[in-house]
């Protein structure tokens, strides 16, 4: 029996317009309104130059109601670590065909609470879906810029990672550059933690369900050194 949860994958060019607009609207509510990040907002939407044809999106929903999302960009393409995040760290931004950057990761806990499903392992399911997609796409790792609190959440979910660098987004605001390896062990730990709170179904094992061709898989990379 279905749990009502579904995680879907689509590229910028193949995602249905209504779903893309919903995603941008949720990002505006979470990153601009709630967290007060200095992000680009236009009307009711949050989006920037990294929302483009090179971008892949993951969206999690319950009974058709979107609750969570993230975006992935292969590091062969322009991505945030070599753009707005470049001043945070001393290390160079990797250019590696087998590595993608995750950004705009969110779970709408307020919406989940209103639906009575806050107990569900939404963060773990979103991470599991990203790991599944990365493994099936031939990616070896995901990099991401996070707070210390988010790094702890990622590790608690079961995804072991390495801290490539520590920096500051602003005075006193520490951020970490994580490399999250795509491995069988991480897959099993993520799945095991989900199983503690949510039945593991055949549908879950197949997440994310592809809505179109993604753009974060390995490709020819002009600079392949990490």
Curated annotation (Swiss-Prot):
InterPro entries to which the protein is assigned, alphabetical: Acyl_CoA_acyltransferase (IPR016181), Autoind_synth_CS (IPR018311), Autoind_synthase (IPR001690)
What domain of life? Bacteria
Q: Which GO terms describe its molecular function?
A: N-acyl homoserine lactone synthase activity
Q: Which reaction does it catalyse?
A: a fatty acyl-[ACP] + S-adenosyl-L-methionine = an N-acyl-L-homoserine lactone + S-methyl-5'-thioadenosine + holo-[ACP] + H(+)
The answer to whether the entry has keyword S-adenosyl-L-methionine is yes
- Broad class of enzyme this protein falls into: transferase
Show the coiled coil region(s). Answer: none
Q: Which UniProt keywords apply?
A: Autoinducer synthesis, Quorum sensing, S-adenosyl-L-methionine, Transferase
Read off the Pfam families from this record.
Autoind_synth (PF00765)
Biological process according to GO:
quorum sensing; signal transduction
Record-listed E.C. numbers: 2.3.1.184
What family does the Swiss-Prot or TrEMBL record give for this protein?
Answer: Belongs to the autoinducer synthase family.
Functional summary from the UniProt entry: Required for the synthesis of OHHL (N-(3-oxohexanoyl)-L-homoserine lactone), an autoinducer molecule.
Name this polypeptide is given: Acyl-homoserine-lactone synthase
